[in-house]
């Protein structure tokens, strides 16, 4: 037995010191795997335990849902992806990309919505014997983002250019979908058509099964966590500036019929900014575009201690990064507003995150925060 082993096995001071040293080294090695090291997460955990619990449950639920679908899958073709990154999808696109990279799932190609008539937009065939399209390890993954359009998976599965015998080999999967219009009559008809396909994935079961039921602010609601939740605790800790000449940024997608008096009365007190990102380079991919939009948004919101926005993806970013803001959710689309309110309920926090239906109300909320 060598000297180190004799010391370790002994009951003397040297043996105990060696054991303590090895135990401490093991804790240091395992710490990144056991604990999130992000400072934002630590702050949330200590200052807002309920809020932190909801965020953690959101991310855990997303991974549970996706891992259950994509276990063993090595390659995917993304369908129904947006053709360009935009204000209503940039953070979701980043979340989808992060999850797939984290799970080492290779994206063979992506097909944007709406489906064009180009030959390269059709799904791959499996008769070439390629391991890439081995039905055991390959899936067609619906990557629809929260943009409001009808679910068109059947365009790919049931399109006349794809023989039904080939379609039967597809493993059809989907990122979470959170809006009621995906359960419309057209979707149900499409799902009925693909029901004979082995290993089918029915979107209509998402709300009842894969999404689970989570308790949000005392109410049990069904919801699908946005793919951007995979970024939770992974983004760099971003701090808002404490004080500027104009304390509040109003970051809008439209003018909300603001009266002229608004500009006259508040133009010195608030900064009004409409969505106007820089142009994308010609060679940029959609993932490059999403990152450019992310950088653009961050460059705006960090300049001010508070902001108001009607852009849902910016609101999500504010929630994840603990940024003080009010989300402007007008009641112009009752159904969508209802579902957004349902799952955002838990993320409203006193003096940090709030939701308002009118811009003037949102500004009054922040003015109250500033007095505290």
Curated annotation (Swiss-Prot):
<feature type="topological domain" description="Lumenal">
    <location>
        <begin position="36"/>
        <end position="372"/>
    </location>
</feature>
<dbReference type="GO" id="GO:0000139">
    <property type="term" value="C:Golgi membrane"/>
</dbReference>
<dbReference type="GO" id="GO:0051321">
    <property type="term" value="P:meiotic cell cycle"/>
</dbReference>
<keyword id="KW-0325">Glycoprotein</keyword>
<dbReference type="GO" id="GO:0051072">
    <property type="term" value="P:4,6-pyruvylated galactose residue biosynthetic process"/>
</dbReference>
<keyword id="KW-0469">Meiosis</keyword>
<feature type="glycosylation site" description="N-linked (GlcNAc...) asparagine">
    <location>
        <position position="38"/>
    </location>
</feature>
<comment type="function">
    <text>Involved in cell wall biogenesis. Has a role in the addition of Gal-beta1,3 moeities to galactomannans and their subsequent pyruvylation. Has a role in meiosis.</text>
</comment>
<feature type="glycosylation site" description="N-linked (GlcNAc...) asparagine">
    <location>
        <position position="128"/>
    </location>
</feature>
<keyword id="KW-0961">Cell wall biogenesis/degradation</keyword>
<keyword id="KW-0812">Transmembrane</keyword>
<keyword id="KW-1133">Transmembrane helix</keyword>
<protein>
    <recommendedName>
        <fullName>Pyruvylated Gal-beta-1,3-epitope synthesis protein 5</fullName>
    </recommendedName>
</protein>
<feature type="transmembrane region" description="Helical; Signal-anchor for type II membrane protein">
    <location>
        <begin position="13"/>
        <end position="35"/>
    </location>
</feature>
<dbReference type="GO" id="GO:0009272">
    <property type="term" value="P:fungal-type cell wall biogenesis"/>
</dbReference>
<keyword id="KW-0472">Membrane</keyword>
<feature type="topological domain" description="Cytoplasmic">
    <location>
        <begin position="1"/>
        <end position="12"/>
    </location>
</feature>
<dbReference type="GO" id="GO:0071555">
    <property type="term" value="P:cell wall organization"/>
</dbReference>
<keyword id="KW-0735">Signal-anchor</keyword>
<keyword id="KW-0333">Golgi apparatus</keyword>
């Amino acid at each position: 037995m060598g000297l180190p082993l004799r010391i370790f096995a002994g009951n003397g001071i040297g043996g105990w010191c060696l054991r303590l040293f090895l135990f401490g080294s093991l804790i240091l090695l395992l710490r990144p795997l056991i604990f999130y090291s992000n400072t934002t997460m630590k702050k949330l955990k200590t200052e807002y335990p309920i809020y932190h619990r909801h965020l953690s449950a959101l991310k855990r639920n997303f991974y549970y849902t996706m891992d259950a679908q994509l276990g063993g899958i090595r390659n995917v073709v993304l369908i129904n992806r947006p053709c360009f990154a935009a204000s209503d999808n940039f953070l979701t696109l980043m979340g989808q990309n992060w999850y797939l990279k984290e799970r080492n799932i290779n994206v063979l190609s992506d097909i944007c919505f709406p489906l064009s008539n180009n030959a390269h937009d059709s799904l791959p065939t499996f008769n070439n014997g390629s391991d890439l399209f081995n039905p055991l390890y390959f899936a067609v993954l619906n990557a629809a983002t929260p943009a409001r359009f009808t679910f068109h998976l059947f365009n790919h599965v049931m399109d006349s250019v794809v023989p039904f015998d080939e379609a039967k080999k597809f493993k059809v999967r989907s990122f979470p979908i959170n809006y009621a219009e995906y359960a419309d009559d057209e979707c149900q008809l499409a799902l009925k058509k693909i029901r004979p396909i082995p290993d089918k994935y029915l979107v209509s079961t998402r709300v009842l099964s894969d999404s689970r039921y989570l308790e949000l602010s005392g109410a049990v609601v069904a919801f699908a966590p946005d793919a951007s939740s995979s970024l939770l605790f992974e983004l760099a800790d971003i701090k808002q500036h404490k004080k500027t000449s104009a304390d509040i940024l109003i970051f809008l997608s439209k003018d909300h019929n603001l009266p002229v008096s608004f500009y006259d009365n508040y133009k010195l007190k608030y900064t009004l900014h409409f969505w106007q990102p820089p142009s994308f380079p010609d060679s940029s991919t959609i993932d490059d575009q999403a990152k450019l939009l992310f950088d653009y948004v961050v460059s705006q919101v960090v300049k001010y201690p508070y902001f108001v926005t009607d852009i849902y993806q910016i609101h999500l970013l504010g929630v994840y990064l603990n940024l003080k803001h009010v989300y402007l959710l007008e009641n112009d689309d009752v159904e969508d507003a209802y579902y957004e309110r349902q799952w955002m309920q838990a993320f409203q926090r006193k003096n940090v995150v709030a939701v308002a239906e009118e811009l003037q109300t949102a500004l009054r909320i922040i003015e109250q925060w500033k007095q505290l």
